[in-house]
Amino acid sequence: MLFNILILSALSLQLCTCFHIKRNLNGSNDVIWDYYDDSKKVQGVSLGGWFVLEPYITPSLFEQFGEDEKKIPVDEYTFTEQLGKDEAQKQLDKHWATYFTESDFKDIKDYGLNLVRIPIGYWAFYLLEDDPYVQGQEPYLDKALEWAKQNDLKVWIDLHGVPGSQNGFDNSGKRGNVTWQDDEENIELSYKTLNYIFGKYGGENLTDTVIGIEIVNEPFHSKLNETDMLDFYYNSYYDFRIKHNSRNFFLIQEAFEPIGFWNTHLNNDYTNVSKPFLNDELLEEGVPKNYFHDIVLDHHHYEVFSVDQLDKSENARIQDIKNYGESVAKEQEYHPSLVGEWSGAITDCAKWLNGVGTGARYDGTFDESQLVRTNAINGTAESQFKFKDKKRSCENVTFVEDFSKQHKENIRKFIEIQLLTYENSNSGWIFWNYKTENAIEWDFKKLVEHKLFPHPFNEYKYFYENGTQIVESAASGNPQNLLFITLSALLVSLSTLL
């Protein structure tokens, strides 16, 4: 037994260096936070559904419109449009005041987490003339920063939705067509919003709490003009560093670009890549030495938004995560990065996860055509549910009370391998989401309560710390098998270092 313990200890020590992150010498902001510090990873949660409504996070807000999904709002835009300004203001004032409170921040700290990512839409600060949105979120954002500071939590402020929608998802505030770049007014208001955020939240007075501002969440590069998108990133960086002289971290969401795409962008070592996107004013004044610094890349990774992903076996899903981690590890020398959204989901069965009226891929009811529906008021949209190729049922995989033992094990394994991989391959992780009303695969709090999320976070049941899976006989305590598996795992670990 003692020999086994010594072997395990040696294995853990070896693993500490498996994915050592190289330091990008352009970085200079260790005082605020060091994203290259292997001893202090980001371990965070998002506070989704608070300032940007998502039907699957808080379905009760949308269920008040009845059972006919043709008439249920699909996003915050149609929610406020359908209720009207006065009623929407009344309901959302209550929601903002109660959905997250000071006690949540204390609980988040008590769970051992160190960061919260706070999504917020442009409409919290400015409105287009015909916007139905209501305002009042900003005072609660300010309270959130106070609560975070009181509980020694760091904060990412994330501009989750921009005018016209950057991706067409309901989490951008407006589901349907991607029209962000179609109107110059949309772009101008996006810059105006960011400059307000940079000025108020990006200064040194908040660097003890805010350790990054994310300029736009999940712009869908394939549905955008990529050159214009890159212009927006570079111009926003100029505003951040030069106009506002911010020393904070500039966060870029990967825009669904392939891993490695951002290596040479916003990087002092690749001026030939950056130069076409630098504005004339900067070029005339002269680009400061080490102009690009303290830039962090935010990756989002899920395994449930395609039929191919859902059809994968448990082992294939686990291998996907390992491969993903290896790819992400290779980009660290260019920009530190972390996985800023991931979940425990191995199905897409949570009610309205894919959007109101769209069904689920898992059971064959998904109808992608419904994603372009933008007007829920007149009821003109057809509600089509496709039942072709129905192989599985969501009946026993939606609510934890119905989960089989095997399904629970599969979720726990999926979460464990992600924790292991994201801890070891980059600067950490931010789980989506801290809580929901009933979508447990996306609910950190419920997952921990039901022992589906390791707590403490390194309390692994199914994997050694190098990602080698523990076989059942070893886990059950058979000394000979345990020794054999442990030695095998050690050899695997050593081979990766040679």
Swiss-Prot record:
Protein name: Glucan 1,3-beta-glucosidase 1
Compartments where found: Secreted
Purpose: Beta-glucanases participate in the metabolism of beta-glucan, the main structural component of the cell wall. It could also function biosynthetically as a transglycosylase.
Single GO molecular function: glucan exo-1,3-beta-glucosidase activity
Listed PANTHER family: GLUCAN 1,3-BETA-GLUCOSIDASE I_II-RELATED, GLUCAN ENDO-1,6-BETA-GLUCOSIDASE B
Known EC number: 3.2.1.58
Family the entry assigns: Belongs to the glycosyl hydrolase 5 (cellulase A) family.
Active site (record annotation): E218 (proton donor), E341 (nucleophile)
Top-level taxon in the UniProt lineage: Eukaryota
Catalytic activity: Successive hydrolysis of beta-D-glucose units from the non-reducing ends of (1->3)-beta-D-glucans, releasing alpha-glucose
Signal sequence segment: 1-18
SUPFAM superfamilies xref list: (Trans)glycosidases
This protein's UniProt keywords: Cell wall biogenesis/degradation, Disulfide bond, Glycosidase, Hydrolase, Secreted, Signal, Zymogen
GO terms, biological process: cell wall organization; glucan catabolic process
GO CC annotation terms, alphabetical: cell surface; extracellular region
Enzyme class, spelled out: hydrolase
Disulfide feature: C349-C394
